[in-house]
Amino acid sequence: MAVFGVTIALLVWVATLLIVSIWKQIYSSWNLPPGPFPLPILGNIFQLDLKNIPKSLTKLAERFGPVFTLHLGSKRIVVLHGYKAVKEVLLNHKNEFSGRGDIPVFQEYMNKGIIFNNGPTWKDVRRFSLSILRDYGMGKQGNEARIQREAHFLMEELKKTNGQPFDPTFLVGCAPFNVISDILFHKRFDYNDKTCLRLMSLFNENFYLLSTPWIQAYNNFENYLRYLPGSHRKIMKNASEIRQYTLAKAKEHLQSLDSSCPRDVTDCLLIEMEKEKDSQEPMYTMENISVTLADLFFAGTETTSTTLRYGLLILMKYPEVEEKLHEEIDRVIGPSRVPVFKDRLEMPYMDAVVHEIQRFISLIPSNLPHEATRDTMFRGYVIPKGTVVIPTLDSLLYDSQEFPDPEKFKPEHFLNENGKFKYSDHFKAFSAGKRVCVGEGLARMELFLLLTAILQHFNLKSLVDPKDIDLNPVTIGFGCVPPEFKLCVIPRS
């Protein structure tokens, strides 16, 4: 029996050596960037803190340099860290790394829509969607009027709180929700509308769940975890409900479609579908249109809503910053005039605060994953086709050479010695290149106009001492999720 046990142990030992030897040969078959040696099957999972992957990537960059390789499950991942490496990948090699890396929790939508599309249609769908958004006012007068109108409704809702504590998640979030809803569907909602609140709840829950450790594990070990219970199932269910809503809106629009007079983005997409009805391989199917609308709806609501909410918490933490903003607003706009986007040219401090909020919170710290579309030589290394590429945005936003004391909230990061707004090329909160956020122009306008309107009419009041406000996100993964909080808004006049 003892001999048998020794024999089994030797066989296991030999098998282990053989597996490691084969794995080493596979691992070293490409001239990849350096990185920690991966274990078979598990890869480098033990080098990552699933509760804070961006921090783990920063530590690995300190050890292996600005370009390094990780293996997670069967995935080969190349991470770019720092301004030069990230800019080089996103701008100088934008075509080679324009693919969308695999995100298993959204596998159903990988070849549809805009955000998660890695199929042959994404370039054309993205290009056409961007042109429609521009036609409907992105960065122009049309969207400014939409935001100003919605700001008025938001101010009325804030007045109804009568200085009592409230959670800003959905109340403030209704403003960007209604702006993008008007662009997509020519529809706005009352702030207590059940459909509006339900959709925002789905957006909010998915943003949170996508940032949890379980989903970080699931997206890298999907083959082993897909059949287990977990929050990946909830995300898929929520995404399906959102898409069912956008599909219903598309079908509703189709019943009253007038090709000569499109009312909104949905109509424009449906008109393209009508043009392709005789095509053997149509690009604009009802399924693709519904996913495209869901992508725009989620991204156009949740990122701006979360940034505004985080911004309010930050301003309560730093009342001296809020006071300076009140002074600038009173001087440039006054108590009653409606803010306009061009006011930012005369309001460098507000412009700096809006940028610093986005820098400080680093909402999507590790970016969405890119993918190499072909074998590519990069800095002397070969990055094979299909490799997942992570251009870390937080490595730019928290670069201590560009932003001294990056862990501190300092509007001065975006002000020169004369108090004028100072642009930084490190500010890539919306990413860059082929996959840059299609709603960047809209989001910039919303953040400036909505935050300015709130502070024009109200003082912010925290329920706790500002020194006790915790700005740390409750979870960090896909995004940085702010802690829940309540506040009071006190009318200024």
Curated annotation (Swiss-Prot):
<comment type="subunit">
    <text>Interacts with chaperones HSP70 and HSP90; this interaction is required for initial targeting to mitochondria.</text>
</comment>
<dbReference type="InterPro" id="IPR002401">
    <property type="entry name" value="Cyt_P450_E_grp-I"/>
</dbReference>
<dbReference type="GO" id="GO:0002933">
    <property type="term" value="P:lipid hydroxylation"/>
</dbReference>
<keyword id="KW-0443">Lipid metabolism</keyword>
<dbReference type="GO" id="GO:0051879">
    <property type="term" value="F:Hsp90 protein binding"/>
</dbReference>
<dbReference type="Pfam" id="PF00067">
    <property type="entry name" value="p450"/>
</dbReference>
<dbReference type="GO" id="GO:0008202">
    <property type="term" value="P:steroid metabolic process"/>
</dbReference>
<comment type="similarity">
    <text>Belongs to the cytochrome P450 family.</text>
</comment>
<dbReference type="InterPro" id="IPR017972">
    <property type="entry name" value="Cyt_P450_CS"/>
</dbReference>
<dbReference type="GO" id="GO:0005743">
    <property type="term" value="C:mitochondrial inner membrane"/>
</dbReference>
<dbReference type="GO" id="GO:0005506">
    <property type="term" value="F:iron ion binding"/>
</dbReference>
<dbReference type="GO" id="GO:0005789">
    <property type="term" value="C:endoplasmic reticulum membrane"/>
</dbReference>
<dbReference type="GO" id="GO:0018601">
    <property type="term" value="F:4-nitrophenol 2-monooxygenase activity"/>
</dbReference>
<keyword id="KW-0521">NADP</keyword>
<dbReference type="GO" id="GO:0016098">
    <property type="term" value="P:monoterpenoid metabolic process"/>
</dbReference>
<keyword id="KW-0496">Mitochondrion</keyword>
<dbReference type="GO" id="GO:0030544">
    <property type="term" value="F:Hsp70 protein binding"/>
</dbReference>
<keyword id="KW-0276">Fatty acid metabolism</keyword>
<dbReference type="GO" id="GO:0008392">
    <property type="term" value="F:arachidonate epoxygenase activity"/>
</dbReference>
<keyword id="KW-0256">Endoplasmic reticulum</keyword>
<keyword id="KW-0560">Oxidoreductase</keyword>
<comment type="pathway">
    <text>Lipid metabolism; fatty acid metabolism.</text>
</comment>
<feature type="binding site">
    <location>
        <begin position="298"/>
        <end position="303"/>
    </location>
    <ligand>
        <name>substrate</name>
    </ligand>
</feature>
<dbReference type="InterPro" id="IPR001128">
    <property type="entry name" value="Cyt_P450"/>
</dbReference>
<keyword id="KW-0408">Iron</keyword>
<dbReference type="GO" id="GO:0009617">
    <property type="term" value="P:response to bacterium"/>
</dbReference>
<comment type="function">
    <text>A cytochrome P450 monooxygenase involved in the metabolism of fatty acids. Mechanistically, uses molecular oxygen inserting one oxygen atom into a substrate, and reducing the second into a water molecule, with two electrons provided by NADPH via cytochrome P450 reductase (NADPH--hemoprotein reductase). Catalyzes the hydroxylation of carbon-hydrogen bonds. Hydroxylates fatty acids specifically at the omega-1 position displaying the highest catalytic activity for saturated fatty acids. May be involved in the oxidative metabolism of xenobiotics.</text>
</comment>
<keyword id="KW-0503">Monooxygenase</keyword>
<dbReference type="InterPro" id="IPR050182">
    <property type="entry name" value="Cytochrome_P450_fam2"/>
</dbReference>
<dbReference type="GO" id="GO:0018960">
    <property type="term" value="P:4-nitrophenol metabolic process"/>
</dbReference>
<dbReference type="GO" id="GO:0020037">
    <property type="term" value="F:heme binding"/>
</dbReference>
<dbReference type="GO" id="GO:0006805">
    <property type="term" value="P:xenobiotic metabolic process"/>
</dbReference>
<dbReference type="GO" id="GO:0019899">
    <property type="term" value="F:enzyme binding"/>
</dbReference>
<dbReference type="InterPro" id="IPR036396">
    <property type="entry name" value="Cyt_P450_sf"/>
</dbReference>
<keyword id="KW-0999">Mitochondrion inner membrane</keyword>
<protein>
    <recommendedName>
        <fullName>Cytochrome P450 2E1</fullName>
        <ecNumber>1.14.14.1</ecNumber>
        <ecNumber>1.14.13.n7</ecNumber>
    </recommendedName>
</protein>
<keyword id="KW-0479">Metal-binding</keyword>
<dbReference type="InterPro" id="IPR008070">
    <property type="entry name" value="Cyt_P450_E_grp-I_CYP2E-like"/>
</dbReference>
<keyword id="KW-0349">Heme</keyword>
<keyword id="KW-0492">Microsome</keyword>
<keyword id="KW-0472">Membrane</keyword>
<dbReference type="GO" id="GO:0019373">
    <property type="term" value="P:epoxygenase P450 pathway"/>
</dbReference>
